[in-house]
Amino acid sequence: MAQLPPKIPTMATAWPEFGGGHHHHAAHGHHHQRSPSMGAFLAAPLPPFPLPPPAPANGGAQQQQQQQQHQPSWVDEFLDFSATKRGAHRRSVSDSVAFLDPVSDDNAGVGAHDFDRLDDDQLMSMFSDDLQPPPPQQQPAAPAASASSPSDHNSMNDEKQDKGETDEAQSECDGATPGQPASPATVDPKRVKRILANRQSAQRSRVRKLQYISELERSVTSLQTEVSALSPRVAFLDHQRSLLTLGNSHLKQRIAALAQDKIFKDGGTEEGDREAAANLPPAKPQERGIPTGGRGPGPRPRQCRPDRQRGGRRGRAMPALVIGRDPDAL
């Protein structure tokens, strides 16, 4: 984009009063102090241009002032604008104003007072042609903004600058670490120590939790290995238990059958004993301690029951026999 010379401000300018603008602005108030003037351009270093041969030392300053008064105003404005553009360096559009080269001693007293009274916003309003075009939503209001006074531009630029400073301070506060506070007045050392202690304790607790989790994982792995090793043995023992349970049930059934057979056999034995006892003859009585089945030394005694049934004669003779049998007993 081609650089054009700055626009001439719409104000009543008194060109001979550049050097004495301080009193003029002081008399007219704050509004005239913020209005742009051409003293800012005279304060910038002038580019080299053909000069007349040097004069003696005592009349050099007077001759230079006369030459500046006889030069046309548009020539000074153009030369000052080009010098300002060459000596200025703006990093981005958001920067307030350019970095100007140091002012030479010859031109320091020409417009220094007016240049000191100008702030960055006024200089930015002078170089408004270099700025980027406004966003689409602000294009309809462009004529009204261009017709506004320089004070409106200054207020808008002040708001932008304040916002940028606030964002920068916020970024610095966010970027500052607790261990390295931004300023000792805003950060409490006790609070910093407490925060550091809390972080260290939290880190230690996290380490302990990780160690506990790793130990649990190792124990789970070892238990899974043991389970995989013991699973076949457990399956084999379970099969053996099922076989033993089946054999035990068979044995119980056999024991029950044998018990029933024993009961039947016991019942049959008792019945046979009763039948045998009924078929046997009655038992014979014993005499004087000698069993009925034995035989004594004397003659065989006679049975009394038949003698009683047959008659009384033999019954009566029986005591004689007994008496005759044992004569010594008398």
Swiss-Prot record:
Map out region (Basic motif) in residue numbers: 190-209
Q: Name one Pfam family in it.
A: bZIP_1
Q: One GO CC term of this entry?
A: nucleus
Compositional bias (Low complexity) at which positions? 57-72, 139-151
Where would I find the bZIP domain in this sequence? Answer: 188-244
InterPro entries documented for this protein: bZIP (IPR004827), bZIP_RF2 (IPR044759), bZIP_sf (IPR046347), bZIP_transcription_regulators (IPR052483)
Q: What induces it?
A: Down-regulated by dehydration and salt stress.
Bias (Pro residues):
45-56
* Key words, A-Z: DNA-binding, Nucleus, Transcription, Transcription regulation
Location relative to the cell: Nucleus
What the entry lists under Gene3D superfamilies is as follows:
1.20.5.170
Q: Which domain of life is it from?
A: Eukaryota
Question: What segment(s) does the record annotate as region Leucine-zipper?
Answer: 216-244
Q: Where is this region: Disordered?
A: 1-207, 267-330
The biological process GO terms on file are:
positive regulation of DNA-templated transcription
Q: Enumerate the CDD domains for this protein.
A: bZIP_plant_RF2
- Extent of Basic and acidic residues compositional bias: 155-166
Query: Where are the compositionally biased (Basic residues) regions?
Result: 21-34
Role description:
Transcription regulator.
The record's section on PANTHER family has:
BASIC LEUCINE ZIPPER 34, BASIC LEUCINE ZIPPER 61
Which protein is depicted?
Basic leucine zipper 2
Q: Which organism is it from?
A: Oryza sativa subsp. japonica
Name of the coding gene: BZIP02
